[in-house]
Amino acid sequence: MAASNFFLLTAFIALVATQAMASDPSPLQDFCVADKHSPVRVNGLPCKDAKDVSVDDFFLAANLDKPMDTTKSKAGSNVTLINVMKLAGLNTLSISMARIDYAPKGQNPPHTHPRATEILTVLEGSLYVGFVTSNQANRENKLFTKTLNKGDVFVFPQGLIHFQFNPSYDKPAVAIAALSSQNPGAITIANAVFGSHPPISDDVLAKAFQVDKKAMDWLQAQFWENNHN
């Protein structure tokens, strides 16, 4: 019985440790304002000396109440991210946020956040949103979609491919997203696959997408933009 309890305890500790490592590390003090000028390189950013911290380290005049320009985006969207690189006080706090503006028929293209879960609420307009599950045993990737209206909330699980689309022909939309990391990261699928530097071999992509290399060469020749600011 003692051996059984020992192995059970060991398994539990391993599980807890795994969960702890699956998100940003917890702070060990009241705050750890990022010192962006430190030569130290760690998994995150080192702390500024507490005596040098001021209230402005926790403040950013981000103008998130103002509409952002979507006209320069082929996707028809503009993501204004507030992460630790813009607001040093977020360091070790496991949170960031973004304002997302969508032109009529604009979208935030399929992408993932490798280090964060996202919760999104619609402030203006309507959005068609969804995410796709990881590879399943039945070889199906299930798609979950929903049309959101003003005030609605939707959550995108960490690391899963997801998107938002404004279905209106004449009305813009606005959303606010909160993310469970000070630096959630974003991988826009089309940009990463077709617009990487240097490019992925067209032999690889042609076989992966089961099309000819001419189609792949055309896709890789397009301009793949970043709609995140």
Curated annotation (Swiss-Prot):
Quote a single Gene Ontology cellular component term: apoplast
Where in the cell does this protein reside? Answer: Secreted, Extracellular space, Apoplast
Instruction: Identify the SMART domains for this entry.
Output: Cupin_1
GO MF, one term, reads: manganese ion binding
Q: Where is the signal peptide?
A: 1-22
Report the SUPFAM superfamilies cross-referenced here. RmlC-like cupins
Which keywords does this Swiss-Prot/TrEMBL entry list? Apoplast, Disulfide bond, Glycoprotein, Manganese, Metal-binding, Secreted, Signal
User: Which InterPro entries has this protein been placed in?
Assistant: Cupin_1, Germin, Germin_Mn-BS, RmlC-like_jellyroll, RmlC_Cupin_sf
* Metal-binding among keywords: yes
* Name of a matching Pfam family: Cupin_1
Q: Which family does it belong to?
A: Belongs to the germin family.
From the Swiss-Prot or TrEMBL record, give the protein name.
Answer: Putative germin-like protein 12-4
Source organism of the structure: Oryza sativa subsp. japonica (Rice)
